[in-house]
C-alpha cells in the first residue's frame, strides 16, 4: 500500500492515501478522483504483484520479455507525447507500451546541461548486457537484494 501510494504520488498522482487504500483493497473509488490517476494506481498495483510473483520463483532468471511485459502493464497503452521545440515548433511522437524506445531521448538539468541517454539502436544490446549482468550477480549472491536492486535501477 505505502509503496504504491508513495511511488505514484512522486509521479504526480493525486489520489489520497485513503483513496488508494480503498481502491487497492476493494476496487472502489471514494470521493472525486481523476480517471487517469485511478488507472495508474491500479496498473502500478498489478505491476508490483507481477514483480513479487516473479521474484518468488528463484529458479527463473530475469528476462527482457518480462521487463517489456511489465512496461506494457504499467503504461497500459500507447500514448502520444507532445513537445514544443525551440522556436515554438510543435512536435509529437508515440511511446509504445511494452517496446523499447524508437527515438532518442534526453533531459536538460536545472543548470541547462543536456544528458543524452542510449540511442534506440543501442538499447536492445544494452538491455541484454543489463539482464545478463543482473542474472549473473543474483546467481553469485555477493550482493544483498537491496544492493542488487539499487544497482539495477
Residue ranges and their predicted role:
Residues 1-153:
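FIC/Doc superfamily catalytic core
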Amino acid at each position: 500500500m505505502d509503496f504504491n501510494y508513495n511511488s505514484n504520488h512522486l509521479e504526480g498522482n493525486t489520489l489520497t492515501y485513503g483513496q488508494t487504500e480503498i481502491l487497492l483493497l476493494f476496487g472502489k473509488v471514494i470521493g472525486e478522483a481523476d480517471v487517469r490517476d485511478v488507472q495508474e494506481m491500479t496498473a502500478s498495483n498489478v505491476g508490483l504483484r507481477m514483480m513479487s510473483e516473479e521474484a518468488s520463483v528463484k529458479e527463473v532468471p530475469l528476462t527482457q520479455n518480462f521487463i517489456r511485459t511489465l512496461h506494457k502493464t504499467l503504461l497500459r497503452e500507447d500514448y502520444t507525447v507532445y513537445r514544443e521545440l525551440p522556436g515554438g515548433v510543435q512536435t509529437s511522437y508515440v511511446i509504445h507500451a511494452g517496446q523499447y524506445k524508437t527515438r532518442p531521448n534526453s533531459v536538460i538539468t536545472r543548470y541547462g546541461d543536456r544528458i543524452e541517454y542510449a540511442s534506440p539502436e543501442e538499447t536492445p544490446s544494452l538491455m541484454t548486457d543489463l539482464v545478463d549482468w543482473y542474472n549473473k550477480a543474483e546467481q553469485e549472491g555477493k550482493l544483498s537484494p537491496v544492493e542488487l536492486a539499487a544497482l539495477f535501477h
